[in-house]
């Protein structure tokens, strides 16, 4: 009963959050931040959290130089946490591993979060960001979940002017990619 009550509480919280995001009632607190500092802080937190769960974590920053991004730090952290939470939920290897890579792709930075979990079938992959979509395997598992976590992630990334997608190989793992536009100062002509 306790576990079911917790699951219901989580579902209510996710539905409330999704409703606020969907109706543009969530207040975003955008700030200009250093991409390097922000993602290194995220990586430090993930390293501790995943280490406590005996899951390997590798962080790599491939950006040649630091740049600024305009983000809501709390909401972007929610994106990363939701993706990592999904990876952990469906991790089926005794030696779980999660990777986080930051890359420079023109006017954007690209964040890649990969795992060595069970992967997602090609049939299900196009729908994983749809509201309430759950794969047949997750519906039949004891893993729980509401089917709105990744739709929340997609909405937040899009509200940041970005895009999100995934690649996956069954039995080998999944990688989620999202891009966030770099901050660029526009010179003012005098």
What are these regions (language model features)?
Residues 3-8:
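Short alpha-helical segment of the dimerization/phosphotransfer core of two-component systems
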Residues 23-28, 66-71:
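Conserved micro-motifs of the catalytic ATP-binding
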Residues 29-47, 102:
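A conserved beta-strand-to-alpha-helix junction within the catalytic ATP-binding
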Residues 49-60:
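Short conserved segments within the C-terminal catalytic ATPase subdomain
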Residues 87-88:
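Short helix-loop "hinge" at the ATP-lid/N-box region of the Bergerat-fold HATPase_c
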Residues 120-132:
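Short conserved segment of the HATPase_c
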Residues 161-162:
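Conserved glycine-rich
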